[in-house]
Amino acid sequence: MGAPILASAAHAVPALETGGHAMDASITSRETKGGRRLWYRMRVIQQPERARACGSGPKSSADRRPVDPPPVVELRIYEGQTWDQAQEKDITFVYNANFFLFATLEHARIMAHARGSASSANTPPVLTGMPVSGMAYLDRPEEAGYFLFPDLSVRHEGRYKLTFNLYEETKEDKDKDKERDVESQPPLTGLSPATGGSFDFRMEVKSQDFIVYSAKKFPGLAESTALSRVVAEQGCRVRIRRDVRMRRRDGKGAGDYDNGEEEYNRRRRTATPDNRNNDFAARARSMSGSTERTPYSADPQRRPSMADYPSQYAQNPPAGGHLQFLGGNASSQYPAAPPQPFAQPPSVPASPVYPPTQAAPYQMQTSYPPPPPPPAPKRERTPSQSGYAPINPAPRRESIHHDYRPSGPIQLPPLPPPPYYPPTPQQSHMPPPQPPQVLPPLQIDSNSKSNNRLPMPSPTALANSAPRPLASLAPLAPLMQSTSSSAGKGPVHPATLPPPAVYAGAKRAHDESFWSEPEHGRYQNGTRDKGRSEDIITDPTSMPFRRADGTEADGIRLRY
């Protein structure tokens, strides 16, 4: 086997195409048994530039991080006694032989180690993939033989270079080596012993240094080169990337291993915006959302209205607005009083505050609207629009009470208090009749029906909400009695009422705040009224009621 002959003046081989890194070539020659001299010229026409370390884990053997771009080695064979003569006769395509190229990996710089420590220089870096390539005869870019390495991966990061070793299997005896030196390398045993073939080492060529990056520092794969495309178009298996896949990251690149020589000029350095501060701000806002919802919870809206009851009953309620929404009959039971000095919180100014003994009928009407026509519930729910002042409203509405105070009789003669006042919504009296201008629409009937479940008049009878003469409105007095929850036959003097502050700070049951069912009856003068549910339908007689002067009279019964 002929020893490799490098380009030198002794062999009349000039320095050929050594200007560029892709044109560096290694040339050798040998003499065959037939007396011919063959010249081998091999060069790396596509140098590797970068790679990503594929690691050394259990699955690293299946991890493919190919060197980019894939190395391409060109081989040409010439025949001639001298190099000048050989360049005129290229026999690459006509020479009958098999060639393969074996790639090995080595460090670009020699690593120094401390004394006494095991030298790891003898441990070669791990190269995975397909390090062997057969020669492909291609017409482009030039007619020559090409070795492609599209599947070479490196496990560890660092700076490396590839060494390509050329082996030849001769097919004809005349092309074998003329004489073999004893000190020369023996031929490799062929893969097919039956044929007696063998592989002879011809030459080697080294690539330029390239960098293997870690996964964190890898700049990404570049677009496939024109040479890779040309080779792939001719049937070779080379991966083609038509889009740039370079990473946009800010960090160190080739400066880690190039010793300050050159940088990878295609790497793009673009700082990625840091969004960690935005995440912290978003979490802070989400955490503060619970505190923002606290002032709008249900408890702060209900508690101030309940706490207003004790201060409202510190003085007598105003006479003009206590029960005017019930028809004005009960509005004359209390003498006029100065406005309340308390200040109601702003969370409940929209809904007027009612005393516990009298607010039940009004709240019952708003919670359970009765079937009468729309005008009655509308005026009932908005007493300020129907011409009647609300019961104990906020201080800003107290002027309304005094404005409507002259609309009906104000003073009542003081009467003896009833013997018993249970702490229930029945603490009221039978309201005396009032002049027509202060009687409310017939929403009182709807309230009594919703509380006592009595049949109500037809909508045509209740449609007229204008004030009526006293004779026509007299039968409504018993209905007022049912809604006002009287505890005695006569009006109750305000001085004798127990302080209703006991209901201000606690929740009450529905039966304590609203009308009890008809089967339970009502207390009047210490006895339970049994005949209230039949007043309208079953009782054919006249309807007695008590006037303001204390006398009883029979009213005209409504027929429907």
Curated annotation (Swiss-Prot):
Key words, A-Z: Cytoplasm, Nucleus, Sporulation, Transcription, Transcription regulation
GO cellular component: cytoplasm; nucleus
Residue ranges, compositional bias (Low complexity): 461-479
Disordered, as annotated region: 49-70, 171-197, 250-560
A biological process from GO: sporulation resulting in formation of a cellular spore
Biased composition (Pro residues): 336-355, 411-439
Ranges of compositional bias, category Polar residues: 444-453
Biased segments, Basic and acidic residues type: 171-183, 395-405, 508-535, 546-560
Stretch forming the signal peptide: none
Motif Nuclear localization signal positions after renumbering to this chain: 49-54
Record-annotated Velvet domain positions: 35-241
Record function comment: Component of the velvet transcription factor complex that controls sexual/asexual developmental ratio in response to light, promoting sexual development in the darkness while stimulating asexual sporulation under illumination. The velvet complex acts as a global regulator for secondary metabolite gene expression. Positively regulates chaetoglobosin A biosynthesis by controlling the expression of core genes of the chaetoglobosin A biosynthetic gene cluster and other relevant regulators in a light-dependent manner.
Name the UniProt record assigns to this protein: Developmental and secondary metabolism regulator veA
Organism: Chaetomium globosum (strain ATCC 6205 / CBS 148.51 / DSM 1962 / NBRC 6347 / NRRL 1970)
Name of the encoding gene: veA
